[in-house]
Curated annotation (Swiss-Prot):
The UniProt record lists the keyword NADP: no
Gene Ontology CC terms: 9+0 non-motile cilium; axoneme; ciliary basal body; ciliary base; cilium; extracellular region; nucleolus; nucleoplasm
Family listed: Belongs to the TUB family.
Signal peptide: none
SUPFAM superfamilies referenced in this protein's UniProt entry, alphabetically: Tubby C-terminal domain-like
Protein's UniProt name: Tubby-related protein 3
One Gene Ontology term of the molecular function aspect: enzyme binding
Comp. bias (Low complexity): 166-188
Deletion consequences: Failure of neural tube closure and death by embryonic day 14.5. Failure of cranial neural tube closure coincident with increased neuroepithelial apoptosis specifically in the hindbrain and the caudal neural tube. In addition, the number of tubulin beta-3 positive cells is significantly decreased in the embryonic hindbrain. Morphological defects in the embryonic craniofacial regions, the spinal neural tube and the limbs.
Gene3D superfamilies per the UniProt record, alphabetical: Tubby Protein, Chain A
One GO BP annotation of this record: ganglion development
Length: 460
């Protein structure tokens, strides 16, 4: 009788189970809310590489063919080029690297955009640089300023100080002149874009276009979109690369997606957005990583020489088109990542020299690690400059990048750090701009962009 009295009834068990389920669901909801809050906070992380809206738009002028020579014939660096910090963001961790000669230009509220022709320097700082700046973003946008950091010129501090003491009428006249100048620069950039489209011509054969280096003096402007459809079924996102043309037209170039059931990251690239299999006729190359996910190699659609020794001609064995190396980031440093890109050299006809290693010891990565760089070109990401005013690393993307992200980067050559070989950056949640120049081709540039998406130790 006592045992029956002490035993809990079915109603008590049900209430206890309901309470347990309610608490578990509450914990799951709290964890989901914390995760979403963390992702939003990470997106707004101030230490991410971002375009700084506080510097005036630089004039974009087409480069002459002689300015591209460092990528063809090696030469000594110019004496007037400042090479501080070009080896990556690690230089910013050292105290002696704080005194960089290239500084971001800060536009004070109330002062007009400085003219290009006037240069000035002052020992004292402008008083308005430390003053609060309400609605700074709107004021800068009225001046037509969309990107940041002037790497070529010193900040015009004297001009800023003079603007603080000038009369309102003088300020209005200078503002009008700056607006006219911005309009003329916009028109010039539009003419340059039309000339670039004319030199590129129509893309008739996607495979030939993907393998061919960009024309000298022409910036190929593309957009990369990420399609997350199917991720709920265990599929990886699909990435599409489109060529931007005038009048908001775009032409499909490449598509890529990560393979399933692979020990390492393997991205297959195709010229057919509906067929991303390796057996498809449109398969043109792949991007493969090492086990750590810090080194990547780009191949064309040729045959692996190890698997087909003596069975195929040398002309059909695969080429290595590029190697991408990320410096391992294990200390939690949330600043820009350091990356190196190795590509085959170019001959005197501006064509890529075929690079067909027979084994791993002859690969691009092995030659780069052994410093055997004959007929090879080494590129690296341009080190961003820390801006105390915005508390972030900034690069001048010329208005092509609008959102902060650790994936934003520019690639340059050591002998000419002002010549942007490639730049990549976020403009929306799943939209990125990808612009590349000679000597890169579309497949190389797309693969470099894909490597930055991979969830690797160097990117965390």
């Amino acid at each position: 009788m006592e045992a029956a009295r002490c035993a809990p009834g079915p109603r008590g068990d049900s209430a206890f189970d309901d309470e347990t389920l309610r608490l578990r669901q509450l914990k799951l909801d709290n964890q989901r809310a914390l995760l979403e809050k963390k992702q939003r906070k990470k997106r707004l992380e101030p230490l991410m590489v971002q375009p700084n809206p506080e510097a005036r738009l630089r004039r974009l002028k087409p480069r002459g063919s002689e300015e591209h020579t460092p990528l063809v014939d090696p030469q000594m660096p110019r004496s007037d080029v400042i090479l501080h910090g070009i080896d990556g963001p690690a230089a910013f961790l050292k105290p002696e690297a704080q005194d960089l000669e290239s500084k971001p230009q800060v536009l004070s509220v109330g002062s007009p955009a400085p003219e290009e022709g006037t240069e000035g320097s002052a020992d004292g700082e402008s008083p308005e640089e430390t003053a609060p700046k309400p609605d700074l973003q709107e004021i800068l946008q009225k001046h037509g300023i969309l990107s940041s950091v002037n790497y070529d010129e010193e900040p015009d501090k004297e001009e800023d100080e003079g603007g603080n003491l000038s009369s309102p009428s003088a300020r209005s006249e200078e503002s009008a002149a700056a607006s006219q100048k911005a309009a003329s620069e916009t028109g010039a950039s539009g003419v340059t874009a039309q000339q670039g489209d004319a030199q590129l011509g129509e893309v008739e054969n996607l495979e030939d276009f993907a393998y061919s280096p960009a024309p000298r003096g022409v910036t190929v402007k593309c957009k990369v979109t990420r399609d997350k459809k199917g991720m709920d079924r265990g599929l990886f996102p699909t990435y599409y690369m489109h060529l931007e043309r005038e009048e908001n037209r775009k032409i499909f170039l490449l598509a890529g997606r990560k393979r399933k059931k692979s020990k390492t990251s393997n991205y297959l690239v195709s010229t057919d957005p509906t067929d991303l299999s390796r057996e498809g006729e449109s398969y043109i190359g792949k991007l493969r990583s090492n086990l750590m996910g810090t080194k990547f190699t780009v191949y064309d659609h040729g045959v692996n020489p190890v698997k087909a020794q003596g069975l195929v001609e040398k002309a059909h064995t695969r080429q290595e088109l590029a190697a991408i190396c990320y410096e391992t980031n294990v200390l939690g440093f949330k600043g820009p990542r350091k990356m190196s890109v190795i590509i085959p050299g170019m001959n005197m006809n501006h064509e890529r020299i075929p690079f067909r290693p027979r084994n791993e010891h002859e690969s691009l990565l092995s030659k780069w690690q052994n410093k055997s760089m004959e007929n090879l070109i080494e590129l690296h990401n341009k080190a961003p400059v820390w801006n105390d005013d915005t508390q972030s690393y900034v690069l001048n993307f010329h208005g092509r990048v609008t959102q902060a992200s650790v994936k934003n980067f520019q690639i340059v050559h050591g002998n000419d750090p002002d010549y942007i070989v490639m730049q990549f950056g976020r403009v929306a949640d799943d939209v990125f701009t990808l612009d590349y120049n000679y000597p890169l081709c579309a497949l190389q540039a797309f693969a470099i962009g894909l490597s930055s998406f991979d969830s690797k130790l160097a990117c965390e």
